[in-house]
């Protein structure tokens, strides 16, 4: 069975990642319609990837009876609206992370999913990388007691990687975008900001940037952190907001039965600068073993995701191993798993309920920063 896909949003993540990946997964998916706020961009993608229908009307995609799965690849502020509409139309939904930017908006999505025959799959691709699900989780499981963990993501400008990806992205001409689009975008964003920072009558630009950062780069790291460390953060001990760099210290309960009731600390550090380097990793420390996973830019297909293990061997010597579970990229693995979920009923790991835990963590971070009373 091949699933018919309708795509809403033909920007960077569509052109560089999802359209090529879906095309190569032609035994699982067939793209039958694509929508973008810029009709010429949608038409370009339709021509390049042999998609029958191009439109500027997202609801034409959502209500098309031939569409099995709606991909929502728009900017964050439209995620909730289109996801809910697609669920109301009975569609399965693949929504790129973040699910949305506020807890109330996430609850609206959850309510819509509960009354729909459709299901929602949230696009946290790092959690589907074979080296994460294979070597990393296997090696971490052999650590008797986790003592500390570190989450780091220092990213250079996306354009550096996109321009060398061989995908030749086309960007919209401003004159092709309706004048009302910016007003609608601002309206949706302001509503989400009010929900994300309840009781605060003065949502500053710094608060808005923090919210957008956690929804973009931060959501990758913090979602991965939650799965790797086996649960929900116990507490947020401190945060630093210094745009465009952000950091935090979390406390986690020990996942080990032998250390029940004990806790350990996790540091999170992330930011975006102009250095063309992508340093994203998660490292977990035990008393005699360290395990880390290193991610590279997802915009260049097939860059290896490696696991590094440092330990003391039976001779008392330092031993270092590097493991690569597969060269298969995380997006291919993710969409292969999504097919199993939608067609064969497999449980969705990156579900709406799971994504809500990220938003709850952001809420706790906002409170620690003094942004919510």
PLM feature spans:
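Contiguous beta-strand/loop segments that form the cofactor/metal-binding neighborhood of enzyme cores
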Residues: 148, 196-197, 201-299, 325-346, ...
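Mid-domain beta-loop-alpha active-site segment that forms a flexible
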Residues: 123-130, 161-233
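C-terminal helix-rich "cap/oligomerization" subdomain common to oxidoreductases
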Residues: 69-71, 118, 253-259, 337-373
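A contiguous active-site-proximal alpha/beta segment in oxidoreductase catalytic domains
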Residues: 100-187
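N-terminal Rossmann-like dinucleotide-binding module
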Residues: 1-50
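Short active-site oxyanion
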Residues: 29-33, 68-70, 212
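Beta-loop-alpha module in the N-terminal Rossmann-like domain of NAD(P)-dependent dehydrogenases
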Residues: 49-112
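Hydrophobic residues in well-ordered beta-strands that form the structural core
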Residues: 95-96, 120-122, 293
